[in-house]
């Protein structure tokens, strides 16, 4: 699969397990579609090198937790390849604000002043959207173009080749995509989507973050530190300071 002038590289541990799917005819059609949209001057998000950022940040054997999203944010500068996450300096989206509220209520962790979730990904939280690209101002513009088959394959591969993962399935879309998960092998937590439209129906109060850590610790694994560095500390680390 190619994007723009160069080939998008999948992180090696993932390439070894799901890379062959990128050679499927539907993925070649998706690649042609992306080139066509860019040639028509469509603003495709996230930028090409960030499309597979979730896999780069969380190699296959390091995955402990999987969060399934739907498709990337479609505003300028928002999407960078991790579901629910935005780059530092971008306003925190409403769904992520509700995620932070639940973490604060569940674990007593103060709400961060940014929406950059890379520290979670580096600890083993795979932040995976079902569809990996979108167009500016057009939510869902790249649905049913081929991404869903690839990310279904990712979920199926994790289900088959790993054990004891935690899957956080928020909303009916994620829960439908997670139907293949063997709950005898993995721990699945379900709740309504954290969107302001549905968070009050059971996402708020779900305690998924403490439950996730309890499961990991029972398996002898280190828990996820759901706190995030301050924006100032983040800027310093990103600047190499």
Curated annotation (Swiss-Prot):
<dbReference type="GO" id="GO:0004844">
    <property type="term" value="F:uracil DNA N-glycosylase activity"/>
</dbReference>
<keyword id="KW-0234">DNA repair</keyword>
<protein>
    <recommendedName>
        <fullName>Uracil-DNA glycosylase</fullName>
        <ecNumber>3.2.2.27</ecNumber>
    </recommendedName>
</protein>
<dbReference type="InterPro" id="IPR018085">
    <property type="entry name" value="Ura-DNA_Glyclase_AS"/>
</dbReference>
<dbReference type="InterPro" id="IPR005122">
    <property type="entry name" value="Uracil-DNA_glycosylase-like"/>
</dbReference>
<dbReference type="GO" id="GO:0005737">
    <property type="term" value="C:cytoplasm"/>
</dbReference>
<dbReference type="Pfam" id="PF03167">
    <property type="entry name" value="UDG"/>
</dbReference>
<comment type="similarity">
    <text>Belongs to the uracil-DNA glycosylase (UDG) superfamily. UNG family.</text>
</comment>
<comment type="function">
    <text>Excises uracil residues from the DNA which can arise as a result of misincorporation of dUMP residues by DNA polymerase or due to deamination of cytosine.</text>
</comment>
<dbReference type="InterPro" id="IPR036895">
    <property type="entry name" value="Uracil-DNA_glycosylase-like_sf"/>
</dbReference>
<feature type="active site" description="Proton acceptor">
    <location>
        <position position="71"/>
    </location>
</feature>
<keyword id="KW-0378">Hydrolase</keyword>
<dbReference type="GO" id="GO:0097510">
    <property type="term" value="P:base-excision repair, AP site formation via deaminated base removal"/>
</dbReference>
<dbReference type="InterPro" id="IPR002043">
    <property type="entry name" value="UDG_fam1"/>
</dbReference>
<keyword id="KW-0227">DNA damage</keyword>
<keyword id="KW-0963">Cytoplasm</keyword>
């Amino acid at each position: 699969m190619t994007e723009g002038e160069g080939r998008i590289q999948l992180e090696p541990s993932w390439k070894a397990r799901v890379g062959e799917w990128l050679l499927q005819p539907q993925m070649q059609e998706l690649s042609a579609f992306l080139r066509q949209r860019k040639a028509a001057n469509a603003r495709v998000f996230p930028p090409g090198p960030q499309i597979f950022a979730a896999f780069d940040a969380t190699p296959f054997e390091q995955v402990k937790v999987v969060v399934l999203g739907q498709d990337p944010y479609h505003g300028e500068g928002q999407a960078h390849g991790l579901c629910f996450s935005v780059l530092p300096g971008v306003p925190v989206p409403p769904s992520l604000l509700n995620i932070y509220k639940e973490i604060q209520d569940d674990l007593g962790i103060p709400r961060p002043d940014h929406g950059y979730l890379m520290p979670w990904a580096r600890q083993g939280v795979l932040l995976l959207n079902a569809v990996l690209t979108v167009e500016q101002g057009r939510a869902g513009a790249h649905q049913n173009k081929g991404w869903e088959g690839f990310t279904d394959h990712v979920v199926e591969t994790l289900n088959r080749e790993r054990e004891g993962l935690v899957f956080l399935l928020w909303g009916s879309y994620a829960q439908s995509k997670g139907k293949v998960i063997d709950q005898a092998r993995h721990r699945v937590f379900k709740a309504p989507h954290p969107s302001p439209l549905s968070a009050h129906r059971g996402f708020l109060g779900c305690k998924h973050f403490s439950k996730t850590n309890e499961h990991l610790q029972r398996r002898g694994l280190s828990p996820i530190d759901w706190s995030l560095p301050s924006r100032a500390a983040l800027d310093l680390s990103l600047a190499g300071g």
